[in-house]
Amino acid sequence: CISIVLIIKKISPIYSLILGAIVGGLLAGWGLEQTVVEMVSGVKDITPAIVRILAAGVLTGMLVKTGSAETIARSIIKALGEKYIYLALALSAMLLTAMGVFIDVAVITIAPIAIITGNNLKLSKMKLLLAMIGGGKCGNILSPNPNTIIAAENFNAPLSFVMAAGVIPALIGLAVTVFVIVPLM
């Protein structure tokens, strides 16, 4: 609670978390030495997950900066054609986010293609955006994002297993987005 209040007050999140942990340890009756030992132990346990998260961020940057993300999106839209534009946009966003690209970056990457195609076909921008965001959320179920990485660490499960467990829910979400939600708009 102390950490959250300090962060809201614009205190550096790192210092806020450290101070919150120290106060929490002292209130638990650990004393300063035991509190510091527990803090170091906690950091040691979570460090591999943090390194994986940073690596996913580097991959995301490379996909966007090299133009690979846009190439993937254009290829999917070209393959499926204008008739299936909503599916193509949702699938593009899903695949990009499944590779670790954040939803906002995926949408910004795909949006210019969506807008041009949507204007040519006189489609609703809201439906185009909904398809991209829905697809992005489906990709998040599969991606090596911080939630997935930490879940794998905490359950002592291989990251690939946790990611694979999301395939069926992601595909169901994609189908619902494209064939149920978008047409209702």
Annotate the PLM regions:
Residues 14, 83-87, 126-127, 160:
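Residues that define the loop-to-transmembrane-helix transition and helix capping
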Residues 1-6, 10-30, 50-58:
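Hydrophobic mid-bilayer segments of alpha-helices in multi-pass membrane transport proteins
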Residues 116-185:
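Membrane-core helix-loop-helix motifs of multi-pass transport proteins
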